[in-house]
Amino acid sequence: MARYTGPLCKLCRREGMKLYLKGERCYTDKCAFDRRPYAPGQHGQRRAKLTQYGIQLRAKQTVKRIYGILERQFERYVEKAMQKAGDTRENLIQILEARLDNVVYRMGFAINRRQARQLVNHGHFLVNGKKVNIPSYLLKPNDVVELREKSRDLEVIKKAVEANKERSVVPWIEVDYDNYRGTFLRYPSLEEVTDLPVDLQTVIEFYSR
């Protein structure tokens, strides 16, 4: 399955909720979902009543779209979360939150996860002093993420830092904007990830059928 490259606002409208895929724009009156809060297409305003399967499917799609993950990889994450001891929902969110592209976004070095993925792909970040260009790379507690010296003048990163530096950083991450680095302190608990608009139990049930 190819990665989605179309309009991001259509994904929010399809899921019937803001996914904040465009970063700062989603908080302004330019947000397409605020103007047209219904599904795209000719019959978008007639949202059908979902079956239990449909609810589970939409929840799964929503999480995938928020984190920018394709089906095969997401399925592997769910399998890994199920095999690990403890709360499967928390295991899954910890895997998702440990992805390098997500941590770059959480640190404020990108305006959204898609931009963070591109920046990682292009080799702009170091992990513990070594270049890592794999967005799905899973960080471990106390790993240090740093912007490469030659990348610090990039306009997209300057704009992202300026937009994000006044916002509070999630408690499992520490950021030093003056030195363009941050530390992934620990894995978050399920309750700490407050910006996920779906119940992960619904997602787990989809793959448990």
UniProtKB/Swiss-Prot annotation:
UniProtKB keywords: Ribonucleoprotein, Ribosomal protein, RNA-binding, rRNA-binding
CDD domains listed in its UniProt record: S4
The UniProt record lists the keyword Phosphoprotein: no
Pfam name, any one: Ribosomal_S4
Residue ranges of domain S4 RNA-binding in the record: 98-161
GO CC annotations on file: small ribosomal subunit
GO molecular function: rRNA binding; structural constituent of ribosome
Gene Ontology biological-process annotations: ribosomal small subunit biogenesis; translation
Subunit details: Part of the 30S ribosomal subunit. Contacts protein S5. The interaction surface between S4 and S5 is involved in control of translational fidelity.
Family affiliation: Belongs to the universal ribosomal protein uS4 family.
Function: One of the primary rRNA binding proteins, it binds directly to 16S rRNA where it nucleates assembly of the body of the 30S subunit.
Family annotation (HAMAP family): Ribosomal_uS4_B
Protein name: Small ribosomal subunit protein uS4
Species this chain originates from: Thermotoga petrophila (strain ATCC BAA-488 / DSM 13995 / JCM 10881 / RKU-1)
